[in-house]
Amino acid sequence: MGKRRWSQHFLRDTSVAQFITELVPSGLDIIEVGPGRGALTLPLAEKSKTIYAIEIDPTLAEFLKRQAPPNVVVIVGDALEIEWPRADFFVSNIPYSITSPLLLKLAKYRLPAVVTIQKEVAERLVAAPGTENYGRLTVAIRCHYDVEVLRILPPHVFSPPPKVYSAVVRLTPRRPCVEDFENFQRFTARLFSTRRKTLRRLKLGETEKRVYQLTLEEIVELYKKHFDTTETCRS
């Protein structure tokens, strides 16, 4: 069992592991964050060129090194802090405590991915404009990806079982909606801090449409009109 401070819930259901493994194309170099005891790592290794397994827990990393075949490269470190190896695909049962920052880092690499995340986060990723779940994370990820929720997972498929349901999500890269993602993130962070205000009140337009009702395309249009590398969102 992993350290609780890293919010690790290990996949224990082999049928779910098989389902996820079958979503990953064969013969690729794979980055896996949070491999734990290797529930996904080992079956993925059978069909992949190389697995770069990034594990923050040194004890789990040593365990995996003893169990894994030669094409699994175990990297001990914080996936949020280190530079990732060059790879073709990303897989992760993402630790709950780092879900949003890890997804945002993944977006910078633009790797195709299959991730397991909290169901509520998955609902945010596919949320429609004008709904409560729609927000900055929705916009940031869909700037780079088409998002599909493929399967809902009950708590008992993990050990220890989390208190919430999870979801298997496929992220397919699309043409980025902007060139400078860092600036776009700063813009959307400021914009969604006033998510219920109208564009008229924010002096970003003449419409009474509220921030959380804007489509991705409308947000990109605002970004290009009102924001560059030296200024912040006008409010």
Swiss-Prot record:
One GO MF term attached to the UniProt entry: RNA binding
Major localization class: cytoplasm
Record's keyword annotation contains Protein biosynthesis: no
Gene3D superfamilies in UniProt: Vaccinia Virus protein VP39 (3.40.50.150)
Keywords from the UniProt entry: Cytoplasm, Methyltransferase, RNA-binding, rRNA processing, S-adenosyl-L-methionine, Transferase
Positions that bind S-adenosyl-L-methionine: 9, 11, 34, 55, 78, 93
EC number from the UniProt entry: 2.1.1.-
Protein name (Swiss-Prot/TrEMBL): Probable ribosomal RNA small subunit methyltransferase A
Species in which this protein is naturally found: Pyrobaculum islandicum (strain DSM 4184 / JCM 9189 / GEO3)
